Regions:
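Juxtamembrane extramembrane loops of integral membrane proteins
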Residues: 69-76
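Core beta-strand residues in small-molecule sensory/regulatory alpha/beta domains
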Residues: 68-69, 169
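Non-catalytic, structured segments within soluble enzyme domains
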Residues: 128, 132-310
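Short capping micro-motif at the N-terminus of alpha-helices
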Residues: 77-78, 256
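Conserved catalytic or metal-liganding residues and their short signature motifs at active sites
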Residues: 3, 24-37, 85-124
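Structural motif marking the loop-to-transmembrane transition
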Residues: 9, 13, 17, 21, ...
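Extracytoplasmic
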Residues: 60-63, 70, 81-83, 91-96, ...
Length: 312
Protein backbone atom coordinates (compact mmCIF):
# COMPACT_ATOMS: atom_id res chain seq x y z
CA UNK A 1 0.00 0.00 0.00
CA UNK A 2 1.45 3.36 -1.02
CA UNK A 3 1.70 6.45 1.18
CA UNK A 4 -1.36 8.08 -0.44
CA UNK A 5 -3.52 4.99 0.13
CA UNK A 6 -2.37 4.72 3.75
CA UNK A 7 -3.33 8.35 4.38
CA UNK A 8 -6.80 7.80 2.90
CA UNK A 9 -7.24 4.71 5.10
CA UNK A 10 -6.23 6.62 8.23
CA UNK A 11 -8.58 9.50 7.34
CA UNK A 12 -11.44 7.02 6.92
CA UNK A 13 -10.74 5.51 10.35
CA UNK A 14 -10.55 8.99 11.86
CA UNK A 15 -13.95 9.90 10.39
CA UNK A 16 -15.62 6.62 11.45
CA UNK A 17 -14.54 6.80 15.12
CA UNK A 18 -16.62 9.90 16.01
CA UNK A 19 -19.62 8.38 14.24
CA UNK A 20 -19.34 5.18 16.29
CA UNK A 21 -18.87 7.09 19.56
CA UNK A 22 -21.70 9.47 18.74
CA UNK A 23 -24.00 6.61 17.83
CA UNK A 24 -23.20 4.83 21.08
CA UNK A 25 -23.94 7.86 23.25
CA UNK A 26 -27.02 8.64 21.18
CA UNK A 27 -28.29 5.13 21.75
CA UNK A 28 -27.56 5.40 25.49
CA UNK A 29 -29.41 8.72 25.64
CA UNK A 30 -32.43 7.31 23.84
CA UNK A 31 -32.38 4.22 26.05
CA UNK A 32 -32.21 6.41 29.17
CA UNK A 33 -35.12 8.54 27.98
CA UNK A 34 -37.15 5.45 27.15
CA UNK A 35 -36.34 3.94 30.53
CA UNK A 36 -37.25 7.19 32.28
CA UNK A 37 -40.57 7.46 30.45
CA UNK A 38 -41.28 3.82 31.21
CA UNK A 39 -40.47 4.28 34.90
CA UNK A 40 -42.73 7.32 35.09
CA UNK A 41 -45.54 5.16 33.80
CA UNK A 42 -44.72 2.38 36.26
CA UNK A 43 -44.49 4.75 39.22
CA UNK A 44 -47.76 6.39 38.20
CA UNK A 45 -49.37 2.95 38.31
CA UNK A 46 -47.83 2.26 41.72
CA UNK A 47 -49.32 5.47 43.10
CA UNK A 48 -52.88 4.51 42.25
CA UNK A 49 -55.39 3.74 45.03
CA UNK A 50 -53.41 5.49 47.77
CA UNK A 51 -55.12 5.84 51.18
CA UNK A 52 -56.38 9.22 52.36
CA UNK A 53 -53.41 10.79 54.16
CA UNK A 54 -55.39 13.93 55.11
CA UNK A 55 -57.54 12.17 57.74
CA UNK A 56 -55.71 12.32 61.09
CA UNK A 57 -58.03 9.68 62.54
CA UNK A 58 -56.30 7.11 60.33
CA UNK A 59 -53.04 7.68 62.21
CA UNK A 60 -54.60 7.24 65.64
CA UNK A 61 -56.68 4.14 65.06
CA UNK A 62 -58.32 2.50 68.04
CA UNK A 63 -58.73 3.57 71.64
CA UNK A 64 -60.47 1.63 74.40
CA UNK A 65 -64.03 1.66 75.62
CA UNK A 66 -63.85 2.26 79.37
CA UNK A 67 -66.36 1.20 82.06
CA UNK A 68 -66.57 3.48 85.11
CA UNK A 69 -68.40 2.99 88.38
CA UNK A 70 -70.70 5.61 89.90
CA UNK A 71 -67.70 7.27 91.56
CA UNK A 72 -65.90 7.66 88.25
CA UNK A 73 -63.36 4.92 88.94
CA UNK A 74 -62.28 2.77 86.00
CA UNK A 75 -63.29 -0.85 86.49
CA UNK A 76 -62.62 -2.28 83.02
CA UNK A 77 -61.67 -1.45 79.45
CA UNK A 78 -62.12 -3.17 76.09
CA UNK A 79 -59.73 -2.55 73.20
CA UNK A 80 -58.20 -3.99 70.06
CA UNK A 81 -55.08 -1.89 70.63
CA UNK A 82 -54.07 -0.59 74.06
CA UNK A 83 -53.71 3.10 73.21
CA UNK A 84 -54.32 6.44 74.93
CA UNK A 85 -53.85 9.49 72.72
CA UNK A 86 -52.14 12.51 74.29
CA UNK A 87 -51.06 15.92 73.02
CA UNK A 88 -47.39 16.64 72.41
CA UNK A 89 -47.20 18.92 75.45
CA UNK A 90 -48.29 15.95 77.59
CA UNK A 91 -45.21 13.97 76.57
CA UNK A 92 -41.84 14.32 78.27
CA UNK A 93 -39.28 16.33 76.31
CA UNK A 94 -36.90 13.43 76.93
CA UNK A 95 -39.17 11.20 74.83
CA UNK A 96 -39.49 13.78 72.05
CA UNK A 97 -35.78 14.59 71.89
CA UNK A 98 -34.74 10.97 72.28
CA UNK A 99 -37.04 9.85 69.47
CA UNK A 100 -35.65 12.44 67.07
CA UNK A 101 -32.03 11.74 68.05
CA UNK A 102 -32.49 7.98 67.67
CA UNK A 103 -34.93 7.52 64.81
CA UNK A 104 -34.36 10.56 62.59
CA UNK A 105 -31.76 13.11 63.69
CA UNK A 106 -32.43 15.28 60.60
CA UNK A 107 -36.19 15.23 61.21
CA UNK A 108 -36.50 19.03 61.37
CA UNK A 109 -34.44 19.50 58.18
CA UNK A 110 -35.89 17.13 55.56
CA UNK A 111 -39.25 17.09 53.79
CA UNK A 112 -40.30 13.54 54.61
CA UNK A 113 -37.57 11.77 52.63
CA UNK A 114 -33.91 12.13 53.63
CA UNK A 115 -31.32 11.33 50.96
CA UNK A 116 -28.50 12.44 53.29
CA UNK A 117 -29.81 10.06 55.93
CA UNK A 118 -29.87 7.19 53.44
CA UNK A 119 -26.26 7.84 52.45
CA UNK A 120 -25.20 8.06 56.08
CA UNK A 121 -27.02 4.85 56.99
CA UNK A 122 -25.41 3.07 54.04
CA UNK A 123 -21.96 4.20 55.16
CA UNK A 124 -22.61 3.12 58.77
CA UNK A 125 -23.72 -0.32 57.60
CA UNK A 126 -20.72 -0.66 55.27
CA UNK A 127 -18.40 0.09 58.18
CA UNK A 128 -19.98 -2.56 60.36
CA UNK A 129 -22.57 -0.51 62.23
CA UNK A 130 -26.35 -0.46 62.15
CA UNK A 131 -28.59 2.49 61.38
CA UNK A 132 -32.00 2.83 59.77
CA UNK A 133 -32.67 5.04 56.76
CA UNK A 134 -36.43 5.63 57.10
CA UNK A 135 -37.55 9.00 58.42
CA UNK A 136 -40.04 9.35 61.26
CA UNK A 137 -42.66 10.39 58.70
CA UNK A 138 -41.99 7.28 56.61
CA UNK A 139 -42.28 5.10 59.71
CA UNK A 140 -45.58 6.76 60.60
CA UNK A 141 -46.94 6.07 57.11
CA UNK A 142 -45.69 2.47 57.13
CA UNK A 143 -47.22 1.67 60.52
CA UNK A 144 -50.59 3.35 59.97
CA UNK A 145 -52.11 4.06 56.56
CA UNK A 146 -49.84 1.55 54.78
CA UNK A 147 -49.87 -1.03 57.58
CA UNK A 148 -51.31 -3.65 55.21
CA UNK A 149 -48.15 -3.29 53.10
CA UNK A 150 -45.50 -2.82 55.79
CA UNK A 151 -44.03 -6.31 55.36
CA UNK A 152 -44.04 -6.06 51.56
CA UNK A 153 -40.32 -5.64 50.78
CA UNK A 154 -40.64 -4.23 47.26
CA UNK A 155 -39.66 -1.07 45.43
CA UNK A 156 -43.35 -0.38 44.82
CA UNK A 157 -44.14 -0.26 48.54
CA UNK A 158 -41.11 1.96 49.22
CA UNK A 159 -42.11 4.40 46.48
CA UNK A 160 -45.66 4.60 47.86
CA UNK A 161 -44.31 5.13 51.37
CA UNK A 162 -41.93 7.93 50.32
CA UNK A 163 -44.60 9.65 48.24
CA UNK A 164 -47.09 9.65 51.12
CA UNK A 165 -44.42 10.84 53.57
CA UNK A 166 -43.58 13.81 51.34
CA UNK A 167 -47.28 14.66 50.87
CA UNK A 168 -47.84 14.47 54.63
CA UNK A 169 -45.01 16.94 55.24
CA UNK A 170 -46.79 19.37 52.91
CA UNK A 171 -49.95 19.53 55.03
CA UNK A 172 -48.83 18.74 58.59
CA UNK A 173 -46.31 20.54 60.78
CA UNK A 174 -43.32 18.70 62.22
CA UNK A 175 -44.95 18.85 65.66
CA UNK A 176 -48.18 17.30 64.34
CA UNK A 177 -46.28 14.49 62.61
CA UNK A 178 -44.19 13.78 65.70
CA UNK A 179 -47.31 13.78 67.87
CA UNK A 180 -49.07 11.31 65.55
CA UNK A 181 -45.97 9.10 65.49
CA UNK A 182 -45.63 9.00 69.28
CA UNK A 183 -49.32 8.11 69.62
CA UNK A 184 -49.22 5.42 66.94
CA UNK A 185 -45.99 3.45 67.20
CA UNK A 186 -45.83 0.05 68.93
CA UNK A 187 -43.72 -0.30 72.10
CA UNK A 188 -44.32 -3.95 72.94
CA UNK A 189 -46.49 -5.64 75.60
CA UNK A 190 -49.63 -4.61 73.70
CA UNK A 191 -48.86 -0.90 74.15
CA UNK A 192 -49.48 1.40 71.17
CA UNK A 193 -48.33 4.96 71.68
CA UNK A 194 -46.08 6.47 74.32
CA UNK A 195 -48.81 7.08 76.91
CA UNK A 196 -49.89 3.43 76.92
CA UNK A 197 -46.23 2.34 77.01
CA UNK A 198 -45.49 4.62 79.97
CA UNK A 199 -48.39 3.11 81.87
CA UNK A 200 -47.52 -0.48 80.93
CA UNK A 201 -43.84 -0.34 81.87
CA UNK A 202 -43.74 2.34 84.58
CA UNK A 203 -47.37 2.87 85.72
CA UNK A 204 -47.09 6.60 85.08
CA UNK A 205 -47.97 9.19 82.47
CA UNK A 206 -45.63 9.97 79.58
CA UNK A 207 -45.25 13.49 80.95
CA UNK A 208 -43.64 12.17 84.14
CA UNK A 209 -40.93 9.93 82.66
CA UNK A 210 -37.37 10.39 83.82
CA UNK A 211 -34.52 10.56 81.33
CA UNK A 212 -33.53 6.92 81.90
CA UNK A 213 -37.15 5.73 81.62
CA UNK A 214 -37.78 7.76 78.48
CA UNK A 215 -34.60 6.43 76.84
CA UNK A 216 -35.68 2.86 77.56
CA UNK A 217 -39.06 3.39 75.89
CA UNK A 218 -37.59 5.29 72.94
CA UNK A 219 -35.40 2.30 72.17
CA UNK A 220 -38.25 -0.22 72.04
CA UNK A 221 -40.02 0.42 68.68
CA UNK A 222 -36.94 -0.64 66.70
CA UNK A 223 -37.39 -4.24 67.94
CA UNK A 224 -39.96 -4.53 70.78
CA UNK A 225 -39.39 -8.25 71.42
CA UNK A 226 -35.60 -8.14 71.25
CA UNK A 227 -35.36 -5.15 73.60
CA UNK A 228 -38.20 -6.23 75.93
CA UNK A 229 -36.84 -5.34 79.40
CA UNK A 230 -38.92 -8.06 81.07
CA UNK A 231 -37.35 -10.79 78.93
CA UNK A 232 -34.00 -9.42 77.72
CA UNK A 233 -32.88 -6.85 80.33
CA UNK A 234 -29.27 -6.84 79.10
CA UNK A 235 -30.29 -6.03 75.51
CA UNK A 236 -32.77 -3.45 76.81
CA UNK A 237 -30.01 -1.79 78.85
CA UNK A 238 -27.66 -1.67 75.86
CA UNK A 239 -30.37 -0.18 73.68
CA UNK A 240 -31.31 2.40 76.34
CA UNK A 241 -27.67 3.48 76.58
CA UNK A 242 -27.45 3.77 72.80
CA UNK A 243 -30.40 6.17 72.90
CA UNK A 244 -28.64 8.19 75.60
CA UNK A 245 -25.46 8.28 73.51
CA UNK A 246 -27.38 9.67 70.54
CA UNK A 247 -29.14 12.26 72.69
CA UNK A 248 -25.74 13.42 73.94
CA UNK A 249 -24.25 13.46 70.42
CA UNK A 250 -27.11 15.61 69.16
CA UNK A 251 -26.91 18.06 72.05
CA UNK A 252 -30.20 17.20 73.76
CA UNK A 253 -28.61 16.31 77.11
CA UNK A 254 -25.40 17.21 78.92
CA UNK A 255 -22.55 14.84 79.67
CA UNK A 256 -23.57 14.85 83.34
CA UNK A 257 -27.18 13.92 82.53
CA UNK A 258 -25.97 11.22 80.15
CA UNK A 259 -23.61 9.64 82.68
CA UNK A 260 -26.14 9.76 85.52
CA UNK A 261 -28.87 8.13 83.41
CA UNK A 262 -26.53 5.41 82.12
CA UNK A 263 -25.54 4.60 85.69
CA UNK A 264 -29.17 3.87 86.63
CA UNK A 265 -30.34 0.25 86.56
CA UNK A 266 -33.60 -0.55 84.76
CA UNK A 267 -36.40 -0.26 87.32
CA UNK A 268 -39.79 -1.23 85.95
CA UNK A 269 -43.16 -0.76 87.62
CA UNK A 270 -45.42 -2.88 85.42
CA UNK A 271 -49.13 -2.03 85.34
CA UNK A 272 -52.07 -4.40 85.56
CA UNK A 273 -52.82 -4.02 81.84
CA UNK A 274 -53.13 -7.49 80.39
CA UNK A 275 -52.54 -6.71 76.72
CA UNK A 276 -55.26 -9.24 75.84
CA UNK A 277 -57.92 -6.72 74.81
CA UNK A 278 -59.86 -6.82 78.08
CA UNK A 279 -58.57 -5.35 81.34
CA UNK A 280 -60.75 -5.91 84.39
CA UNK A 281 -59.83 -4.10 87.60
CA UNK A 282 -62.94 -4.87 89.68
CA UNK A 283 -66.29 -6.72 89.57
CA UNK A 284 -65.26 -9.22 86.86
CA UNK A 285 -68.64 -10.98 86.68
CA UNK A 286 -70.50 -7.71 86.36
CA UNK A 287 -68.07 -6.58 83.64
CA UNK A 288 -68.79 -9.78 81.71
CA UNK A 289 -72.51 -9.06 82.03
CA UNK A 290 -72.07 -5.50 80.69
CA UNK A 291 -69.95 -6.76 77.83
CA UNK A 292 -72.62 -9.29 76.88
CA UNK A 293 -75.24 -6.53 76.88
CA UNK A 294 -73.07 -4.40 74.59
CA UNK A 295 -72.43 -7.35 72.30
CA UNK A 296 -76.16 -7.65 71.68
CA UNK A 297 -76.17 -4.12 70.22
CA UNK A 298 -72.69 -3.75 68.70
CA UNK A 299 -70.01 -5.98 67.21
CA UNK A 300 -66.68 -6.53 68.99
CA UNK A 301 -64.75 -3.96 66.94
CA UNK A 302 -67.32 -1.25 67.65
CA UNK A 303 -67.05 -1.94 71.37
CA UNK A 304 -63.26 -2.08 71.37
CA UNK A 305 -62.47 0.85 69.09
CA UNK A 306 -65.10 3.45 69.95
CA UNK A 307 -63.25 5.25 72.80
CA UNK A 308 -66.42 5.48 74.92
CA UNK A 309 -66.86 5.96 78.66
CA UNK A 310 -69.71 3.95 80.19
CA UNK A 311 -70.73 5.05 83.69
CA UNK A 312 -72.63 2.38 85.64
Amino acid sequence: MGPRQRNRHLRAKTHIAPIIIGSFFGFMLLASVAFGVGMIGVVDTWLQDLPDYTDTDLYLSSEPTTILDAEGNEIASFYTQNRTTVALDQISDYVIDGTVATEDERFYEHGGFDLVGIMRAAWVQLTGGSEGASTITQQLVRNTILSDEQFDVTLQRKVREIYLAVKMEEIYSKEEILNMYLNAIYYGHGAYGIEAASNVYFSKSASDLTLAEAALLVGLPNAPSQYDPTINPDYALQRRNTVLDRMLRNGYISQEEHDAAQAEPIQLNLSETSGTGVDVYAYPYFVDYVRDLLSNEFDYNQISVSYTHLTL
